[in-house]
């Protein structure tokens, strides 16, 4: 029986475990949090810090694994690439390419050096150095950890006097002690976050989405809704698909899933993030329902060297919306219940996956890690989607008790 090691134990790993079990694989989940939910579904738990490459590598050798993934688990991606390279296991790319993709500063430098559209950006480790580069940026700017996902540690800065605080916030969310400052891009339309797939370095499946933010949330840069298909102009989608393929070729990518974020600003399409892993927010699961393409199964098969079914580009069946369920702005307390009006539930709701349960303490929506779970909705067209989702405050009820 082949062994698949999954780095991370969040609920986003559960569909990967299910796919692996359906293929007859033995699943080992790894992190340093034994109570994480995914460990209840795996065949074996390995207690190791997944950002410690050498410790995780030693565990992988001892356990004689046949494949490794860090699905929807950003901190483990570089470790997964490192172990795959050391053990000769399949992975999307080399460890060096992964280092570039996983560090926002290195990635921005790579994009700029190779002629991709890219905002002014600089990577720093010293808190004081940015104050020598104030005129380099087109203000406002955005400050981020270089190695953190889920919008953690991200702050928009409009005034120089607020920069120091934003740097401290970014460093608080960083694992490697580095942060990036870049021009704040005002999107034309919406930001896109999707999970494409390559086979032998060729982009075989790619979608674009409309990622909507809750402007009233405690962190207004954390996605609250993701909608397929995108309203992005087709010419911009075609340009981005071509540029993503160029990026894949330059980095000598192989086979696997990616989480890719793109946008259009100043009349130009931008590749913002590329990570060799499945995305959080259950993106691949929604794409499976909307497009009929199972990239989770394909990624698992790839990881352990099994033949992959042909991956084909398909069209979206209707209009789909993923809602990231979160507390109302400024609200916190003990969760009593999450309910949906019956008419909405019966007509549009397809999936409910709540991570929070009654009795849990709910905090304001400051990052993806503060979500209460996800819901998938299907509509016949975009007008119907927007009409219903714009009234979610009326039909979605999140009841909290004071702490």
Q: Can you describe what each PLM-predicted range is?
A:
Residues 1-96, 128, 306-309, 315-318, ...:
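ATP-binding N-terminal substructure of ATP-dependent carboxylate-amine bond-forming enzymes
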Residues 100-180, 200-202, 226-242, 246, ...:
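Active-site nucleotide/adenylate-binding loops and adjacent lid/helix of ATP-dependent enzymes
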Residues 155, 183, 228-229, 288, ...:
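Short, well-ordered beta-strand elements within core beta-sheets of diverse protein domains
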Residues 158-159, 325-329, 375-381:
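Short beta-strand-to-loop capping motifs
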Residues 161, 183-191, 195-253, 257, ...:
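ATP-dependent carboxylate/phosphate-activation module, predominantly the ATP-grasp catalytic core
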Residues 258, 342-360:
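A structural supersecondary motif
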Residues 307-347:
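A glycine-rich beta-turn/hairpin centered on an aromatic-Pro dipeptide
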């Amino acid at each position: 029986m082949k062994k698949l090691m999954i780095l991370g134990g969040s609920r986003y790993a559960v569909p990967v475990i299910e796919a692996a079990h359906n293929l007859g694989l033995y699943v080992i989940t790894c992190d340093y949090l034994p109570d994480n939910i995914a460990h209840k579904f795996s065949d074996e738990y390995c207690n190791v810090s997944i950002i410690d490459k050498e410790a995780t590598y030693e565990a992988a050798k001892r356990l004689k694994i046949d494949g490794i993934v860090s699905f929807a688990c950003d901190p483990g991606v570089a470790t997964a690439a490192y172990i795959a390279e050391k053990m000769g296991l399949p992975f999307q790319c080399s460890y060096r390419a992964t280092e570039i993709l996983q560090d926002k500063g290195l990635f921005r430098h790579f994009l700029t050096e190779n002629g991709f559209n890219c905002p002014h950006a600089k990577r720093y480790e010293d808190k004081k150095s940015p104050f020598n580069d104030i005129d380099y940026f087109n203000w406002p700017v955005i400050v981020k950890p270089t190695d953190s996902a889920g919008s953690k540690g991200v702050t928009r800065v409009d005034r120089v006097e607020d920069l120091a605080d934003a740097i401290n916030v970014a460093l608080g969310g960083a694992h490697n002690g580095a942060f990036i400052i870049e021009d704040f891009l005002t999107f034309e339309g919406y930001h896109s976050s999707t999970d494409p797939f390559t086979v032998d370095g060729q982009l075989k499946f790619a979608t674009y989405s409309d990622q909507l933010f809750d402007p009233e949330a405690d962190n207004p840069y954390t996605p609250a809704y993701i909608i397929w298909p995108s309203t992005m102009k087709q010419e911009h989608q075609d340009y981005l698909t071509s540029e993503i393929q160029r990026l894949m070729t330059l980095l000598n990518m192989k086979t696997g899933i990616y989480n890719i974020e793109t946008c259009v600003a100043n009349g130009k399409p931008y590749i913002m993030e590329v990570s060799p892993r499945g995305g959080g927010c259950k993106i691949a699961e929604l794409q499976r329902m909307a497009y009929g393409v199972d990239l989770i199964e394909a990624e698992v098969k790839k990881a352990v060297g099994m033949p992959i079914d042909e991956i084909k580009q398909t069209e979206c069946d209707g209009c789909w919306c993923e809602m990231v369920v979160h507390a109302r702005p400024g609200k916190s307390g003990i969760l009593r219940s999450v309910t949906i009006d019956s008419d909405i539930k019966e007509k549009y709701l397809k999936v409910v996956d709540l991570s929070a349960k009654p009795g849990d303490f709910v905090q304001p929506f400051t990052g993806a890690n503060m979500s209460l779970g996800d819901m998938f909705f299907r509509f016949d067209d975009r007008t119907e989607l927007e009409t219903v989702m714009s009234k979610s405050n009326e039909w979605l009820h999140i009841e909290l008790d004071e702490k």
